[in-house]
């Protein structure tokens, strides 16, 4: 199943949203997309500083991306290193145990799967997040503050693009949409939709105590991952074989100032790696992979998602 702008899943809801007459865009999008958004509950175990274990529980949202039971959500919702069980709650209240197939902390994305047998699962229709502009309508659907408020819709606009945020653990996320559609705890992993009810992002975070500032991961980032998982049951990431530091960080920390403002400064090339075979050397600065501009380790990783093992790619240094 190739993931295009148009739905490829036979059960994907490709209804055209028409807000003529008394129907609002929000109402039309709700009718089209709401049944594709699910609630997620997790049970896990955490340890305190004295190594005492206690049971934890978590809540979040997810989006059905295939009628075969594949669901896209955030890594921090279902993090396999912290959870022992994951349960999906469909829009009609049906509960199903889910298995985590893939997750990535840096991207804050995860793919889980439920058994589709006997279920009428409606997959979302995918939009093209590269076509999203500031000022476009943005509609978030998820479960803010828990399952009691499941299938909640909030509406706003795309307020910004290519946003970089720093998370509580000090890690950064890049290339995000900013929206004023309300995103609250529990909304994580839910969908951000355009005015046609097409999925354009996965909601991930809100800015501290600020109202009206939420962030969403553009859906195009997840498409190559979903494509591989739905076809092969797993995602094999491409490894370049370099250890590097963001140029922006190097320019702050380093003894010398580099001749460019952004990119990845190669600290070490792993022997026998694809980078080694291609002739990359220590002190090279990677600025482009294929058609994708590289400004940091995070954007380098994102650029490599579009390639499979064995593909040839041009790297600019």
Model-derived features: where do they sit?
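Serine-dependent protease modules
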Residues: 2-254, 259-262, 267-271, 297-301, ...
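Flexible, small-residue-rich helix->loop connector segments that border functional cores
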Residues: 29, 283-286, 315
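Conserved PDZ fold ligand-binding element
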Residues: 71-75, 275-296
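Secondary-structure boundary/capping motif
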Residues: 290, 316-317
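Exposed beta-strand face motif in extracellular beta-rich ectodomains
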Residues: 311-313
């Amino acid at each position: 199943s190739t993931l295009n702008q148009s739905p490829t899943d036979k059960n994907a809801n490709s209804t055209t949203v028409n807000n003529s007459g008394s129907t609002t865009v929000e109402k039309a999008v709700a009718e089209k997309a709401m049944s594709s958004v699910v609630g997620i509950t997790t049970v896990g175990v955490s340890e305190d500083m004295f190594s005492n274990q206690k049971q934890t529980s978590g809540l979040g949202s997810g989006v059905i991306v295939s009628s075969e039971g594949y669901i896209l959500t955030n890594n921090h919702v279902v993090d396999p290193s912290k959870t022992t069980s994951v349960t999906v709650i469909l829009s009609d209240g049906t509960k199903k145990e889910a298995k985590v197939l893939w997750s990535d902390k840096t991207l804050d994305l995860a793919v889980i799967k439920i058994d589709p047998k006997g279920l009428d699962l409606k997959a979302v229709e995918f939009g093209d997040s590269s076509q999203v502009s500031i000022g476009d309508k943005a509609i978030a659907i998820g479960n803010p503050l828990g399952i009691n408020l499941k299938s909640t819709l909030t509406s706003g606009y795309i307020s910004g693009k290519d946003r970089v945020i720093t998370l509580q653990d000090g890690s950064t996320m890049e290339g995000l949409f900013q929206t004023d559609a309300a995103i609250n705890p529990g909304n994580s992993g839910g969908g951000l939709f355009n005015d046609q009810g097409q999925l354009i992002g996965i909601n991930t975070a809100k800015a501290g105590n600020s109202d009206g500032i939420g962030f969403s991961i553009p859906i195009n980032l997840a498409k190559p991952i979903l494509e591989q998982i739905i076809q092969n049951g797993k995602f094999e990431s491409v490894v370049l074989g370099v250890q590097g530091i963001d140029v922006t960080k190097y320019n702050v920390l380093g003894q010398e100032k580099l001749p460019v403002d952004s990119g990845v400064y190669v600290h070490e090339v792993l022997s026998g790696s694809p980078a080694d075979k291609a002739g990359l050397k220590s002190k090279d600065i990677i600025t482009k992979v294929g058609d994708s501009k590289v400004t940091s380790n995070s954007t380098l990783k994102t650029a490599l998602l579009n390639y499979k093992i064995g593909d040839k790619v041009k790297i600019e240094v």
